[in-house]
């Protein structure tokens, strides 16, 4: 990048990871336009994770990062494995050459992505310095969710999608969608059209 301005990432996020070890003396990883996001070849869920991360980074920084199969080389690497014992746990390790997010499952890697996402500042047109760090994290509770009642009030589709995205950002893994109640029936069932033809207007 020709731009000399650099913004620094901040790992003090919500929820705070279980273990954060910042290497103050080590060189940071510089997130720039040339950074690549890599994932295990042939794994569609990990490819989707990589594409999610690329989308998040574009929203935050304006950078369009290349997504490619393979887990060798410099860049952001998503991989299965690591030492997390919880299936939704993950490890995030940053060196000057790589950002490696690993977990025993694709879900664990996804939550590692959320931690990276929250650490990156909203900064268009500048490079981002990610301090060298090792983060080990896992959820304390297997059920982490929130409830949204759409039976009593109308919600735009985009609002519901935004709500789900905020759940993911905060490492929630359950979306309790309250679709029906006395006030109305909100979910369309093709074989039972009267549920929405009549029930949605109550």
Language-model features: locations:
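A conserved hydrophobic secondary-structure block that centers on an alpha-helix together
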Residues: 149-182, 189
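The substrate-binding groove and active-site-proximal loops of carbohydrate-active enzymes
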Residues: 102-103, 144-157, 198
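Generic, well-ordered alpha-helical scaffold segments in large soluble proteins
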Residues: 56, 119, 163-166, 170, ...
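Short acidic, gly/pro-rich beta-turn/loop elements at beta-sheet edges
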Residues: 47, 111, 156-158, 187
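Acidic, contiguous N-terminal accessory segments
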Residues: 2-144
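Aromatic- and acidic-residue-enriched carbohydrate-binding clefts of CAZyme catalytic domains
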Residues: 183-202
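Short, surface-exposed, polar/charged, turn-prone segments marking secondary-structure boundaries
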Residues: 65-66, 129-130, 173-177, 202
């Amino acid at each position: 990048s020709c731009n000399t301005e650099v913004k620094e990432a901040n790992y003090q996020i919500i929820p705070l990871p279980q273990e954060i070890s910042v290497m103050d003396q080590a060189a940071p990883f510089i997130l720039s336009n040339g950074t690549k996001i890599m994932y295990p070849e042939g794994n569609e869920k990990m490819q989707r994770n990589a594409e999610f991360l690329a989308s998040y980074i574009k929203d935050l920084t304006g950078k369009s990062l290349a997504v490619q199969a393979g887990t060798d080389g410099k860049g952001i690497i998503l991989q299965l494995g690591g030492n997390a014992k919880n299936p939704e746990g993950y490890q995030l390790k940053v060196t000057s050459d790589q950002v490696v997010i690993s977990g025993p499952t694709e879900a664990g890697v996804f939550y590692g992505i959320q931690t990276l996402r929250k650490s990156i500042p909203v900064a268009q047109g500048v490079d981002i310095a990610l301090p060298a760090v090792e983060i080990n994290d896992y959820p304390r509770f297997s059920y982490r969710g929130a409830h949204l009642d759409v039976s009593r009030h109308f919600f735009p589709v985009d609002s519901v999608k935004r709500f789900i995205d905020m759940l993911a950002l905060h490492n929630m893994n359950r979306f309790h969608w309250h679709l029906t109640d006395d006030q109305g029936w909100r979910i369309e069932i093709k074989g039972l059209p009267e549920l929405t033809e009549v029930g949605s207007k109550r």
